[in-house]
Amino acid sequence: MKVFRIFIITFSYYLISCNADISKEKNNNQKSFQKVKIYSVPSSFTFAGESIPLDLPDVRERFDKELHVNSYLHSSTILLLKRARRWLPQISEILKSNDIPEDFKYLPVIESGLENAISYKRAVGFWQFLAPTARENGLVVNNEIDERYDPIKSTYAAVKYLKKANKKFDNWVSSAASYNRGVRGIENSMKSQKVNDFFSLYLNKETTRYIYRILAVKAIFEDPSKYGFNLDSLDYYYPEKLKEYKITRSIPNLTNWSLTNGSNYKELKRYNPWLRKNSLTLRKNKNYIIYLPNR
């Protein structure tokens, strides 16, 4: 009987302890849940100087969705912010000097994450050009050279595309949408639906989301701390010091060439990803710039 009483007392203490732990864990979970921040859609917002009609319920809700998706996509958004410090100043300068609104710098952010990505459709580079479109806009794409992998040259190609698109639509939001759907795709949708602006169009999910992702990235990048991203200056990636080599004649072996110039093939490929083979054959009166670390 005494043994049974001891068992009951011990078991009771165990249950009390378990309940206390469960209650403590529940309170901790509730506190953690309460720390999740809800972000408000701005009262007004623009893209490329054009007002976004946030009074429309679907526009507001789609923007709200992308704000939260991208705010809580922590690792990806942090890396985008880090890379942006290296690339967006250069991209912005090219856009502005060619009369393209600076907000278009956010297109390569969502297109490729500011990396030389390759899509399942074989779109390549920061600006995700397909080979035919790249050639149409002045890029060299062949067996040895693929300038879609050159962030600077491909930005100039994007400028050409966007100028043609805006000449067609006279609207920068629609021009941005055409970068995803194609000029003809947006134009056909406008004709069939008898409207002439993006926010009145019923479009495929990908293109619709594309614009709102751009808006969300712009909001976050313009005020990262507001959305929970607090990076110190040392956290960012910055442009590296590089030395230019003007190439005026063919190079039969790029590995040997890089070693001769105090570098190696790995560094050559890092700073010149547009070189697709171990050789560079120049046509008459053609030259290129190759970059290597400036030691």
Language model features with spans:
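An acidic, Gly/Ser/Thr/Pro-rich helix-cap/linker signature
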Residues: 4, 13-99
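Solvent-exposed, acidic/flexible segments
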Residues: 73, 77-88, 97-100, 119-127, ...
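Short, functionally critical alpha-helical segments immediately adjacent to catalytic or ligand/cofactor-binding
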Residues: 100-115, 175-181, 218, 268-271
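Substrate-binding/active-site groove segments that recognize
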Residues: 122-143, 155-158, 162, 186-189
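Catalytic and binding regions of secreted/periplasmic enzymes and modules that target cell-wall glycans
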Residues: 162-189
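Catalytic cores of secreted or luminal carbohydrate-active enzymes
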Residues: 205-228
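Primarily a LysM-type cell-wall glycan-binding module
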Residues: 232-262, 286
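Extracellular LysM carbohydrate-binding repeats and other cell-envelope/extracellular binding modules
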Residues: 271-295
